[in-house]
Amino acid sequence: MENNIENQCIPYNCLNNPEVEILGIERSNSNVAAEIGLGLSRLLVSRIPLGDFILGLFDVIWGAIGPSQWDIFLEQIELLIGQRIEEFARNQAISRLQGLSNLYRIYTNAFKNWEVDPTNPALREEMRIQFNDMNSALTTAIPLFSVQGYEIPLLSVYVQAANLHLSVLRDVSVFGQRWGFDVATINSRYNDLTRLIGEYTDYAVRWYNTGLNRLPRNEGVRGWARFNRFRRELTISVLDIISFFQNYDSRLYPIPTIYQLTREVYTDPVINITDYRVTPSFESIENSAIRSPHLMDFLNNIIIDTDLIRGVHYWAGHRVTSHFTGSSQVISSPQYGITANAEPSRTIAPSTFPGLNLFYRTLSDPFFRRSDNIMPTLGINVVQGVGFIQPNNGEVLYRRRGTVDSLDELPIDGENSLVGYSHRLSHVTLTRSLYNTNITSLPTFVWTHHSATDRNIIYPDVITQIPLVKSFSLTSGTSVVRGPGFTGGDIIRTNVNGNVLSMSLNFSNTSLQRYRVRVRYAASQTMVMRVNVGGSTTFDQGFPSTMSANGSLTSQSFRFAEFPVGISTSGSQTAGISISNNPGRQTFHLDRIEFIPVDATFEAEYDLERAQKAVNSLFTSSNQIELKTDVTDYHIDQVSNLVDCLSDEFCLDEKRELSEKVKHAKRLSDERNLLQDPNFRGINRQPDRGWRGSTDITIQGGDDVFKENYVTLPGTFDECYPTYLYQKIDESKLKAYNRYQLRGYIEDSQDLEIYLIRYNAKHETVNVPGTGSLWPLSVESPIGRCGEPNRCVPHLEWNPDLDCSCRDGEKCAHHSHHFSLDIDVGCTDLQEDLGVWVVFKIKTQEGYARLGNLEFIEEKPLIGEALSRVKRAEKKWRDKREKLQLETKRVYTEAKEAVDALFVDSQYDRLQADTNIGMIHAADRLVHQIHEAYLPELPFIPGINVVIFEELENRISTALSLYDARNVIKNGDFNNGLSCWNVKGHVDVVEQNNHRSVLVVPEWEAEVSQTIRVCPGRGYILRVTAYKEGYGEGCVTIHEIENNTDELKFKNCEEEEVYPTDTGTCNDYTAHQGTAGSTDSCNSRNIRYEDAYEMNTTASVNYKPTYEEERYTDVQGDNHCEYDRGYVNYRPVPAGYVTKELEYFPETDKVWIEIGETEGKFIVDNVELLLMEE
């Protein structure tokens, strides 16, 4: 045996106290603060009624602690951080605490007296006085517990005072009316309560983290022990308390609530911590002793391996088996430390008897022997034995019991450990270190609060809160992360688009009970979530974002996702949460799920409160004179549904009152809406008022989505003929230099374009996915007995709070069902009557839309940059308009001259004898050079030049009609296919862009013919516009039964002009077409035609482009559909076509027109037989 005393086995409790070495402060009182914190936690998680809670808070804290105890309470953090509070600040804090204690004693006595005789006016007045005194004292005192420089030493008493303040504010929220306070005062104090919950919570978390981060992270076990003690003791005295603060919200929690703490704390190292030079590093201990975030688990057993070194048996390693909440599946930990067999492995397991199936206490036996620098020996710092104690004080031994007691750090309440224990052993970790001649094996005990049980039990008479870390399964993409400090434990983080987690629930009710469900969450974007419990579901519900992207988690980051559809269930069930609108894999945080039992009365009261809150939120103030700007017409309808669904049995009077208020809100909404006929009583009812639209739009009555009429816009097969709906806001309704907003509700849509047009167009394309019927199959019929939609039946909800976020001109993949688009108005001019055009348009075959509750309202006056921007836009528009007026004058003059030249006189009822189709087309092209006859966004809406455009366009239509009347050939333009034509062999009629058709004769054996009745002895002109591709000839022949035959021939390159008056070659012919001075009547007509269409008789070799139509490119900028106005069936002939004609004098009353070819392809655009004028 070694003789040196320092090399002997030295019991742990014989060593100099480690804390004496660290801070020079005795340890004897260190558990007083823990007792106070744990006592308050026990009270907070209890189910006692509110009156008993008030008295209990006095008995446990404010009536039980005197100045000396408060002094010890302050010593706690001083000891841990090595900072003493100045004497003056300490005495001031203790005096304030004692003063609050004295006031609260008077307050609780007054409350007890009032409870005995609650209608006594004197006692009610006394309660009002005592509340006001208590509230004022706390409002004054709490800032003194946050003195600059002492925030961390005073943090525990700050939280105690804050807890008292919130408790008192909850009292007045619950009892205030019975004490005689008016409703306005109660609401004001309730607002104080909800505001201070956040302020007190965030303050405590901020300074807890600051204090923890200031602690040094060195000195091995000794430094880690101090760090861990700060973390554990302030978790108990600060974080545990503030995690309950949300429960003081009396309107959120109107009945007793079961609360659970799932966080873990770690007791001090049970080995010697004085010689930090030979122990593991701080980082090594922190990494090996502290568990990573995980689902909450419960201890099954510990299998301990024992090793032997220099005659000392010690705890060398172990494994832990456990199970998740409500799960029988065994979870095995990795091996901690080493595997050893100096003795058989010991399995440490608690009893399986309910209530005894845990360890609440450990008694550890450490061994320490310091190495000798002179005579080398092995330093040993290990644990030789531990006694694990059950609540009945039954003991399971690992080798032997020691004297290091975990109750010194986690004390019980009173003497009865069966009901007074505060924590249960949940896990054990181990840190092992070999350093030079020193060995350290450090088991660390992990504890969870007694409030978190191994079953998720939901009771039918209280609100049950279940932290979501008590799930038994997480899907891929979901994990557990460190809690932000105020949630009572860790939380769930997920980025999945689908199922998130599964948990086991045990409903204590044996018959079906209805519960409302809500989930506390934080999200940087809107989310759609549902909860399934067995066969019952809340259905999908949309919830708004609560925080900015990448923002830190504070108390304000979390909100409740409260589902309007409850569940009905009983017994044991498996529950799941799923998220369904997260294709971008955004991250959400989930804290806990809550179950609120409801009966008919509770549900009626809940619905009434919800309806009252919804109605009151419509108005800017309590006098209900003005609506809030952001309150939409659709929202008013939904609030009306809430009111309509209130129970006549429980709240008939309140329902009538709320109904009048919401009707008033609807009238105010109608008054501020500048749209005419916003409820769609009709479309195209009045020429100059209300809605104008395409004939395929349908108006439908209210349904499960809309309370009033809505419109359905179908898709279209031609983008030049879109489905459209529009209305003009008259200039007289607009105010100068104001911003206006168009908004409404879209049930679903695809490729819906929305425009607001004034100086320019504001444009969005919105795609809003629908979900089919709003009514799930599992609910009762949504149809009332008279066929009306039953809007009181729970139904699916989407994303009700997210505003449309697309920028101007973007095509959004997914929008909110609520849309809005704004436009700025500059100076108003009633003479110009510019107004604002509201346009909805669909120009795709796949497009569709169902929308209603449309509004156009005044949003706000323009100031600053917005005012400057609209003035610049207005000036730019006026400058552009002045240039347009000059250009229009020139173009109009040219176009009118060309149009007038088509007719004999100003009566416009007879064409000139030499007017041909090319001349009409040329004149029409000039007419279409008049810009802004119609809006480019929708060529049905008149622009500033519509009058002069339609004047000339009507005359062009007259000319075409007169010209068509002269053509005795039916369907000569093939726009009706082969109607009226006789066909032999195979031919095609190919429809070109913009409704133009051509005849294609692809084979030499094919023939197309038509028999025509004529007047014998009269003269006719046969005119053909065609194109020959490839070799051979294309022929159009006219003949009678016998003889009198003539024909027009077309070649790819003419060697000789076929006109009787012209014998030039192909090149001569092409050159001749450009001779403006030609006197030949046939050629003069062709000159005009070719000038109009820039004809080129040299054909392209490529077949397809030769008869594929070109488009006007000079009409309304980028809108190629604008020229459809009034001129649909006559299009410009593409380059490459040739027009030829001949004179024919029939001798009988019947002639035949025959079309054929000898080789290649023959493409015919038009065949005309015109009667010559006498």
UniProtKB/Swiss-Prot annotation:
It comes from the Bacteria. Keywords: Sporulation, Toxin, Virulence. Disulfide bonds: none annotated. One of its GO terms (molecular function) is toxin activity. Pfam families: Cry1Ac_D5, Cry1Ac_dom-VII, Endotoxin_C, Endotoxin_C2, Endotoxin_M, Endotoxin_N. InterPro entries: Cry1Ac-like_dom-VII, Cry_V, Galactose-bd-like_sf, Pest_crys, Pest_crys_Cry1Aa_dom-IV, Pest_crys_dom-III, Pest_crys_dom_I, Pest_crys_N_sf. GO terms for biological process: sporulation resulting in formation of a cellular spore; symbiont-mediated killing of host cell. CDD domains: delta_endotoxin_C (cd04085). Toxic segment of the protein is located in the N-terminus. Promotes colloidosmotic lysis by binding to the midgut epithelial cells of many lepidopteran larvae. Belongs to the delta endotoxin family. This is Pesticidal crystal protein Cry1Eb. It comes from Bacillus thuringiensis subsp. aizawai. The lineage of its organism: Bacteria, Bacillati, Bacillota, Bacilli, Bacillales.
